[in-house]
Amino acid sequence: MSNSLGNNLLYQGFLTSTVLEHKSRISPPCVGGNSLFQQQVISKSPLSTEFRGNRLKVQKKKIPMEKKRAFSSSPHAVLTTDTSSELAEKFSLGGNIELQVDVRPPTSGDVSFVDFQVTNGSDKLFLHWGAVKFGKETWSLPNDRPDGTKVYKNKALRTPFVKSGSNSILRLEIRDTAIEAIEFLIYDEAHDKWIKNNGGNFRVKLSRKEIRGPDVSVPEELVQIQSYLRWERKGKQNYPPEKEKEEYEAARTVLQEEIARGASIQDIRARLTKTNDKSQSKEEPLHVTKSDIPDDLAQAQAYIRWEKAGKPNYPPEKQIEELEEARRELQLELEKGITLDELRKTITKGEIKTKVEKHLKRSSFAVERIQRKKRDFGHLINKYTSSPAVQVQKVLEEPPALSKIKLYAKEKEEQIDDPILNKKIFKVDDGELLVLVAKSSGKTKVHLATDLNQPITLHWALSKSPGEWMVPPSSILPPGSIILDKAAETPFSASSSDGLTSKVQSLDIVIEDGNFVGMPFVLLSGEKWIKNQGSDFYVGFSAASKLALKAAGDGSGTAKSLLDKIADMESEAQKSFMHRFNIAADLIEDATSAGELGFAGILVWMRFMATRQLIWNKNYNVKPREISKAQDRLTDLLQNAFTSHPQYREILRMIMSTVGRGGEGDVGQRIRDEILVIQRNNDCKGGMMQEWHQKLHNNTSPDDVVICQALIDYIKSDFDLGVYWKTLNENGITKERLLSYDRAIHSEPNFRGDQKGGLLRDLGHYMRTLKAVHSGADLESAIANCMGYKTEGEGFMVGVQINPVSGLPSGFQDLLHFVLDHVEDKNVETLLERLLEAREELRPLLLKPNNRLKDLLFLDIALDSTVRTAVERGYEELNNANPEKIMYFISLVLENLALSVDDNEDLVYCLKGWNQALSMSNGGDNHWALFAKAVLDRTRLALASKAEWYHHLLQPSAEYLGSILGVDQWALNIFTEEIIRAGSAASLSSLLNRLDPVLRKTANLGSWQIISPVEAVGYVVVVDELLSVQNEIYEKPTILVAKSVKGEEEIPDGAVALITPDMPDVLSHVSVRARNGKVCFATCFDPNILADLQAKEGRILLLKPTPSDIIYSEVNEIELQSSSNLVEAETSATLRLVKKQFGGCYAISADEFTSEMVGAKSRNIAYLKGKVPSSVGIPTSVALPFGVFEKVLSDDINQGVAKELQILMKKLSEGDFSALGEIRTTVLDLSAPAQLVKELKEKMQGSGMPWPGDEGPKRWEQAWMAIKKVWASKWNERAYFSTRKVKLDHDYLCMAVLVQEIINADYAFVIHTTNPSSGDDSEIYAEVVRGLGETLVGAYPGRALSFICKKKDLNSPQVLGYPSKPIGLFIKRSIIFRSDSNGEDLEGYAGAGLYDSVPMDEEEKVVIDYSSDPLITDGNFRQTILSNIARAGHAIEELYGSPQDIEGVVRDGKIYVVQTRPQM
């Protein structure tokens, strides 16, 4: 029952003997005037009211229009003063204030009403209440609550009274039959006081009449409807099976109670189905009775009404209304004299009866809930190690030994000076045929050569249109030629001159007439004709193909040799689908050998085919069974590859989605046979049907599925040709395409009315036959193939029997039946759950060999696709949904994506994160929105990473092959984008965009994160990546809007502000540089604001940061100039470096660290030793001091390296910055002097550190390489340009190396003891990541956990953001060599972070599962760790007496500090 409608009727029951004339729903939220209401208070209404569902039997008495009042249609907050209630209690509340409570027991249904009225009370009263269930003492909080009700501390409900004159009134509706009583207090907000019942709660008992007979029988269909209505009222919750059963029995009990109170089964049926004839007034007699119109006719008429209305998704109550309206329409027809038999013949012709039965089955009121199985999503993880694309390419670029003809072609091309327009090599018998076309001085030169041993004659002609045979002019015939009817014949001659090493037969033809476009030919060997796989050879004279090769580039990043093979065979493939599928099958072995890029090439080719970018049929007739057999062969090979090469499963699924299933001969043959039967049975043997029949016989294709659907839609629309063309055009078939078929379709359909039923039936069956061949991933077809079906033969038409796939899980078929029945539901949540459950059940079968594996794969692909379309259809359902529902949808779509892709570990951990966020929200955790925002950010990163993978893998192949094949450029430009859009990733991205602003608002995050709060004025410049402009010098003050900022970049000269949607850490290198350089830096989370800023490119903006926002406005040149002058006045003096000298030692211990020997990093860590609290650990350190690099370089063993570096340094000084990379590479060639090895070993062992050489010479070599990498980082681009920017002499920069033992960290952190974003020195700001700190300070995507902590309350850290970094770095016990330059000591220059710190061993990248991380899941653990980090920072700040920038790690709960420096 509709609550709003039901309560409007309830309002009418509270009035005196008046009723509103109009019957429409009343929705204004105002409360009616009191004149009507007061009359009700004084005396009980004489009006007899009998409530029956949504209708009310009343005696109408009209009132003047001006006295009508609009009452609120809110479901619960209703005015109540009916004194006719069964139970009434009065309470004195002091003074002249009284409370009256009336309880109205259920008269029908299961709703009790409790009315409250306070007389002479305050204006602001609230009912503070809860329900007490039978056998319980604690309050429960019913789901049915009046408007304005709020939950108070999860313990009570608080509902405002409605003021009416001097009274305050309120009604509660109680549907839960388990509730025995209502307990409450009244809160007087105006006087801030509680009104109690003698110091305790008020308690009002509900009245429940006893059932007269315990075994009252209720028809099951009525119990089902009542159960459904209860479930709907309670918010369509996802009940477990035991709760579902309990609810079903509760519905039965409600109906039994109703019968016990005197209601008949007929009354109940009428109430539930809204057909109570007693609900009509005497003024409106009801003519239609249920007995007049049989149910099946009413259902058929309702179906017709529903179809005409556009098949809307009616709620159950509307469906019943429609059924009764249909019954009423038919009754009117009967009254006009039409008989029931005539009605039946008119309505149930054609397929209407079958459709009605199917529709009614799908729309039944049965409670169809699903309890999904509990699963650990970790089982979804697919991790495969496939060869990197670069390595595969290197293998592919190692060409096999050239054949004789290819070697000849290479040498011949080098001899030809003229531009080569076309080059083709054809396979012929046991050899090859080369054709080269060149252009010279207006003449076309054709050179042919073959390595066949027997004498060969060329049988040839010329063409003015492709494929045409015209006899060549006699003037151009080579010696020995003869002229025939439409051709010439010329013998090949042995090639014995030209200095070519390969001896072949060759022939040259020179064509002077520029009107010819190509040359068709065949070869003649004795009496044998040699053709191009059954067709004529043809070579074009156009330069287009050569230009295409140039546009295609060199094929880098592709399986080039395979793509070239595909391009060479395309002329053959375009003859028919049989040819294309057989060629593809022949190439699967080559693709397997080429690996990931090979299958990418096949996917690109098949995708071009599926999107009609390639010709489907050209001058060739083929039987449908031959096409289906070729498909069958190809899909068998793809199925086998799916089993044997699991690392390529994602690409193989995508290939299969572009190819129909195919099948044994009978399946394809039925396409040919069945169309004949359709024509014969329905008398439609000419016109369009005959033309389509010819096309089907000679070259059926996926277009035929669309044509069949267009015919069905045309017939259903009562033969509207507009509908026919609409279906065709929406699916890419135009009139021109119909005419382009070898067997063209010229005519439009033209059927008679009496053909309608039979054609709908037969074409519906035919559609299944077409889809069985062409639409392997069609849902209905895929389900039928897995569950099995049988189609009987008829006359010459063969029968088809498909057996069910064995080993399907228990209950799996029920899931599929549900999916088919509900696939078009508008409310998609339950459908999505069933689809995902079906995919989860199917997954284990896909991971093991099965002779019907491809049927299971096509089913899985179809289920995957259906999830996407269902989600897109369900967007409307989410328009007003709460964030929890959007998060649930996100989790379903993410699960679907994880089921479809490889290397999905990050996606699976995102999925676990969403489930945790939902759990936090449902559990009342205040941090749920903050945590969900981090999961959302990580999910976006995962999607971006997946999109980048697709682009890297597929786009080069698409561009190379597409350029050669002449595919439209627009199709190439969006190739990867369209691949992504075809999957769940696009739907997921859309859902994330819906949720993001909601989470930001809930978590009070705003639209900005201010990283460097500096006011700035400048010209707006928009760039894709900060990295691409980091070395630029902007002459004018510039505000950069950069789409991508990773965190490691430099901010270019002249930039005064940097705005990005990216999320670098607040403590990343670029963030620190921005604050030090007084550059405004902020992340903008609002896409609308970002778009507005981008649209202002070229204009001058003033940016004014606040703690949580940036206010921007356009300004003029004068304001810009005044701002620039101010900046220039504040520019600091030039910085200077002092060159350090070698101090005589290759290695020193921590107690020898001085400013002449090492940088601030080493000195600070030595200073902390013994001074910090015992709870803070300091790692043992030694160092290679300043000057050691220069000393090593000057050693005799490194003379060659020194000379090479000298040359490169000169090159660099002349402005050739490419020398930087060469210098770094050359530094790595240094050899270690024996004395260095000796001293370093002694110092490390003397300090208690392990000596790498003890594990073998190889380990020392690893350590030595790490040391050299630190030295070489002096010449990394970022550092070099940074020193130039502040005019530091780069030659004076010296590099010491701090050597520390690595602590295998659980977490790493960076602390700024003054909040860098706000400048607040009373609070500490810190960021924490899993594993080593490189993910925090380096260019690793995502955000760290961030928090602040007041120094006066170090026990109360406040989390600002949860982590979204997908990767953590972990390492075994090892040694790290840290850069320690003299550039880090300069005040006003942030030299820290510019140079590399290199561990001896490589870190392991681990995808992080935050759902099992105690820092996230355990609040007490988090509070302890964060407090300890803050304490360590505070202690070090106090030790130095100034703000500090501190790095450290956490291991087994203990804090270690690895370095500190003054905070810039």
From Swiss-Prot:
Q: In which tissues is it expressed?
A: Expressed in leaves.
Q: Which domain of life is it from?
A: Eukaryota
Enzymatic reactions: [(1->4)-alpha-D-glucosyl](n) + n ATP + n H2O = [(1->4)-6-phospho-alpha-D-glucosyl](n) + n AMP + n phosphate + 2n H(+); ATP + protein L-histidine = ADP + protein N-phospho-L-histidine
What is the E.C. number? 2.7.13.3, 2.7.9.4
**InterPro entries in alphabetical order:** ATP_grasp_subdomain_1, CWD_DUF7067, GWD-like_N_Ig, GWD1_pHisD, PPDK_AMP/ATP-bd
Per UniProt, the keywords (alphabetical) are: ATP-binding, Carbohydrate metabolism, Chloroplast, Kinase, Magnesium, Metal-binding, Nucleotide-binding, Plastid, Transferase, Transit peptide
GO-annotated molecular function:
alpha-glucan, water dikinase activity; ATP binding; metal ion binding; protein histidine kinase activity
| Cofactor(s) needed | Mg(2+)
Location of this chain's protein in the cell = Plastid, Chloroplast
Q: What does the record give as the active site? A: H1069
Give temperature effects on activity: Optimum temperature is 35 degrees Celsius.
pH dependence (record): Optimum pH is 7.
Q: What does this protein do?
A: Acts as an overall regulator of starch mobilization. Required for starch degradation, suggesting that the phosphate content of starch regulates its degradability. More active on alpha-1,6 branched amylopectin.
The record's family statement is: Belongs to the PEP-utilizing enzyme family.
Describe the protein's quaternary organization and the partners it interacts with.
Homodimer.
Additional detail? The reaction takes place in three steps, mediated by a phosphocarrier histidine residue located on the surface of the central domain. The two first partial reactions are catalyzed at an active site located on the C-terminal domain, and the third partial reaction is catalyzed at an active site located on the N-terminal domain. For catalytic turnover, the central domain swivels from the concave surface of the C-terminal domain to that of the N-terminal domain.
Domain note for this entry?
The N-terminal domain contains the alpha-glucan binding site, the central domain the pyrophosphate/phosphate carrier histidine, and the C-terminal domain the ATP binding site.
What name goes with this protein?
Alpha-glucan water dikinase, chloroplastic
